Regions:
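Short, well-structured active-site flanking segments
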Residues: 91-101, 174-177, 236-241, 476-496, ...
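Short active-site loop at a secondary-structure junction
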Residues: 67-72, 389-399, 422-427, 450-470, ...
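Conserved catalytic neighborhood of penicillin-recognizing serine enzymes
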Residues: 110-135, 186-189, 256-257, 435, ...
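Active-site SXXK
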Residues: 82-83, 229, 299, 359, ...
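A penicillin-recognizing enzyme superfamily signal
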Residues: 78, 289, 293-296, 302, ...
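Non-catalytic, structured segments within soluble enzyme domains
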Residues: 22, 27, 111-367, 532, ...
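Beta-lactamase-like hydrolase cores
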Residues: 18, 27-44, 192, 306-319, ...
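N-terminal type II signal-anchor transmembrane helix
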Residues: 1-51, 89, 108-109
Length: 850
């Protein structure tokens, strides 16, 4: 009896000692334990998604793919698959399975090192949220205590829901919702039993048990899960047999992007990181942009087609690489496709290798193993490139352009395949709503994979004659009118600084003598612009440009400003053109309309400052001082003293700080009124004439009238010295668009081409705004304005219409007249008494006006 008594005492002491040890261990570990109460308000990492204005997914940013689901949204069969495999006694224990803990402790004691045993789902949840994945006894003890705490805080269903959304399942997929999409491309409710079991088998080793890494291992692991489900009574023998016989059909499925616009979505990403830091990638933000799918894709297609058209007419630069030469042993198909898979694709351009070639046809192998045929129709364009101004002869047979072993580029045109090449030239397009600044479309280059440099917002390029409408606006605000006569004759003036004559020339070098300002802009006469610049003063003109939002540091204070020597981005140019079309208001471009959190709550909604031509909003600069010399006079030798010029310079009242591209939230406000509404109408009317001209002369943008077949549009070409940059900017109802094209290498110019007859409707001659940039503008605007009713230009209050003589700009006194618009009080008062003859002077080769 004494022995039994002592044995009981010893047992009680051991129990007390064990309990005390556990309590002591708990008190020692307790300060190191995190607060499990945070699980009540846990925010799972969810990627940021970027949408178009019409709700189409454009991009997704974030390291972790996750689709949060409630437990009710997860099929019970999938829940049971995880319970059977990971924790069959889940509903019976209180966070810790004593059998599993005993096994882990025994292994640690007898092996001499820590090794993780069977953890419950609650323990796994504790580890995933609060602990590192290291396999140590200390971490295991913490895991146990945390699991017990979690079971006290949360219900079993809450634990399961968190676990099934948190668990890592391979290929950046976190949670069963993301795994279903990544491996099978469908939501969880559409998964088969076999597919659910495949996913449930992943937590043990997601990198090696996933079906994309090893189908054999994935199948074996799936079968283990099915066996556990059968033994636990979750499925029948028939269901088990059927699921076990299924072949796992898994492929990697990227997020379902409806359409891609990487230059714009990269701008969104940067803005979100600026606002929210790294949390932008984790908190499930939904960002809605201002673009729609139809309009944005029209812009991207217009830019790509125009760049490829330019590139083709300048000739073929040859293969990108030669893998084997004619006569050498050819590579086998696997070696070719392995090589091609290392190369990117650029829009419609795919890398390929020529495997066969004869005079009539070539066969090229694509990266996916497909062979395509290249016939003469798809190769005839490929004249050899000699330089930017010279092309070789048109190929007469296929082998004149391609040979076996060459790595080339191809693209599909209809049902046929054409030889292609990655363009050297690049382009950008920006389109905005002139009333509120919403970006309607933005393209920063030919292809984001080729170059991530966003030319729409980052490229400062000389604007050439695209600047003339702004300068003529300044001149008219100083006293000129659309009927003012300026002398279109050559200029030669000594430049003391340069030590030579400065002789600006028209392009083409034709001169018409005295002409009206409207014609000077419509035909883009350089010397006429220079005379207007001299009349109003360089400093006045340079300062006036800031009204249109152009940064002062990019504006030169020399007469070359008249020819477009200032450098702006396409976005800045589009913003400036909006002022001329919206009644004179400087709107702020923005591209984010709304930001929501992961629950759909609105965090930000744009409230842009709008233009309101009908509102009585004064011009913030006040009235510009008029010059009495800027009346209807011959401007050949007009000059104003420096003192007069400086006294008339309007001081900018707009801050020149960084102009944010995201409109600020707040009450409705109006954009600054920077030029008066009647004046903006005059320049808008003049831009219309740049397209449609007048009897006897054609505007430089005439192709837009032909292509769009509507008269409520206006625009201006722009070409810089040596054609290094080409522009076309203009408006239509509710839209302003600017297009730029040129080389990133400033040493290269756009050159010229000769007609070959091999390309349908090929443009030839000197490149420039009308030939190189305008085709993209025309194609885009035609798509955007399709179905939009024509809206004739309607003069605002303060505009009067007067019949004038075309040659003198005075009141008409005969048949050679037209109606002209004037700001009330500036119309001519004298009748024309004679007609001034027009002298045409031709100083060289004729090529495209700019």
């Amino acid at each position: 009896m004494k022995f039994v008594k002592y044995l009981l005492i010893l047992a009680v002491c051991c129990i007390l000692l064990g309990a005390g040890s556990i309590y002591g261990l708990y008190k020692y570990i307790e300060p190191q334990l995190p607060d499990v109460a945070t699980l009540r308000d846990v925010r799972l990492q969810i990627p940021m998604q970027v949408y178009s204005a019409d709700g189409e997914l454009m991009a997704q940013y974030g390291e972790k793919r996750r689709i949060p689901l409630t437990l009710k949204q997860i099929p019970p069969v999938m829940v049971n698959a995880f319970i059977a495999t990971e924790d069959s006694r889940f509903y019976e224990h209180h966070g810790v399975d004593p059998v599993g803990i005993f096994r882990a402790a025994s292994i640690a004691l007898f092996s001499g090192h820590a090794s993780q045993g069977a953890s419950t789902i609650t323990q796994q949840l504790a580890r995933n949220f609060f602990l590192s994945p290291e396999k140590t006894l200390t971490r295991k003890i913490k895991e146990v205590f945390l699991a017990i705490r979690i079971e006290q805080l949360l219900s079993k269903d809450e634990i399961l829901e968190l676990y099934l959304n948190k668990i890592y399942l391979g290929y950046r997929a976190y949670g069963v919702g993301a795994a279903a999409q990544v491996y099978f491309g469908k939501p969880v409710e559409q998964l088969t039993l076999s597919e659910m079991a495949t996913i449930a088998g992943l937590p043990k080793a997601p990198s090696t048990f996933n079906p994309l890494y090893s189908m054999d291992r994935a199948t074996a692991r799936r079968n283990v899960v099915l066996s556990r489900m059968l033994s636990e009574g979750y499925i029948s023998q028939t269901e088990y047999d059927q699921a076990r016989s299924d072949v796992i059909d898994a492929n990697y499925h990227a997020p379902e992007i409806a359409f891609s616009s990487p230059y714009l979505t990269e701008m969104v990403r940067q803005e979100m990181v600026n606002r929210y830091g790294e949390k932008a990638y984790e908190d499930g933000y939904r960002v809605y942009t201002t673009v729609t799918r139809k309009v944005q894709q029209a812009a991207q297609q217009a830019v790509r087609n125009n760049v490829m058209d330019y590139d083709m007419r300048h000739g073929y630069r040859g293969p990108s690489n030669v893998l084997w030469k004619v006569g050498e042993s050819a590579w086998d198909s696997k070696k070719i496709t392995d090589s091609l898979k290392t190369l990117p694709t650029y829009g419609p351009l795919l890398p390929a290798v020529v495997t066969q070639a004869d005079p009539q046809e070539a066969v090229a192998l694509l990266a996916d193993g497909t062979s395509v045929s290249l016939r003469m129709d798809g190769i005839r364009w490929a004249r050899p490139y000699r330089s930017d101004t010279l092309q070789g002869p048109t190929p007469r047979k296929v082998t004149d352009a391609v040979q076996t072993g060459q790595q080339i580029w191809v693209r599909q045109v209809g049902d046929a395949w054409w030889l292609a090449q990655v363009p050297d030239v690049n382009s950008a397009l920006v389109s905005i709503n002139p009333q509120n600044g919403a970006v309607m479309a933005l393209v920063g280059g030919f292809d984001f994979n080729q170059s991530k440099f966003n030319r729409a917002t980052q490229a400062l390029r000389q604007v050439g004659s695209n600047i003339k409408p702004f300068l003529y606006t300044a001149a008219m605000d100083k006293g000129l009118t659309l009927a003012s006569i300026l002398n279109d004759v050559p200029i030669s003036r000594w430049d003391a600084g340069a030590g030579s004559d400065w002789q600006p020339k028209n392009s083409p070098p034709q001169y018409a003598g005295p002409i009206r300002l409207r014609q000077g802009l419509g035909q883009s006469k350089n010397v006429v612009m220079v005379r207007a610049m001299r009349a109003m003063g360089v400093d006045y003109a340079a300062e006036y440009l800031q009204r249109f939002g152009f940064p002062a540091q990019n504006i030169v204070h020399t007469e070359s400003l008249a020819l477009g020597s200032a450098s702006f981005t396409p976005l800045q140019v589009a913003r400036g053109y909006a002022v001329m079309t919206n009644g004179g208001f400087l709107i702020d471009p923005y591209f984010i309309s709304k930001i929501e959190n992961d629950q759909g709550g609105v965090l930000f909604e744009a409230k842009p400052k709008i233009a309101c031509a009908e509102c009585d909003i004064p011009v913030i600069y006040g009235d510009t001082q008029k010059s009495n010399v800027l009346e209807n006079k011959d401007m050949e030798d007009v000059a104003i003293s420096q003192e007069q010029q400086n006294s008339a310079v309007p001081q900018p009242q707009l801050e020149q700080a960084n102009q944010a591209l995201v409109a600020q939230t707040g009450a409705q406000e109006y954009a600054p009124h920077v030029i008066n509404t009647p004046l903006s109408f005059l320049i808008k009317s003049a831009l219309n004439t740049n397209i449609f001209g007048e009897p006897g002369w054609q505007g430089t943008g005439w192709r837009a009238g032909r292509d769009l077949q509507r008269r409520d549009i206006g625009g201006k070409t722009g070409t810089t010295n040596s054609s290094k940059d080409a522009w076309f900017s203009g408006y239509g109802p509710g839209v302003v668009t600017s297009v730029w094209i040129g080389f990133d290498d400033h040493r290269r110019d756009l050159g010229r081409t000769t007609a070959s007859g091999a390309i349908k409707d090929q443009i030839s001659g000197y490149e420039g705004g009308a030939k190189s940039a305008q085709p993209a503008w025309d194609a885009y605007m035609k798509s955007v304005l399709e179905g939009v009713p024509e809206q004739p230009l309607t003069p605002p209050p303060g505009i009067v219409t007067v019949n004038i003589d075309r040659n003198t700009g005075q009141l008409a006194n005969g048949g050679n007249s037209r109606e002209e618009y004037f700001i009330e009080g500036t119309q001519p008062t004298r009748q024309a008494v004679h007609e001034v003859g027009t002298e045409i002077i031709d100083n060289g080769e004729t090529h495209e006006l700019f």
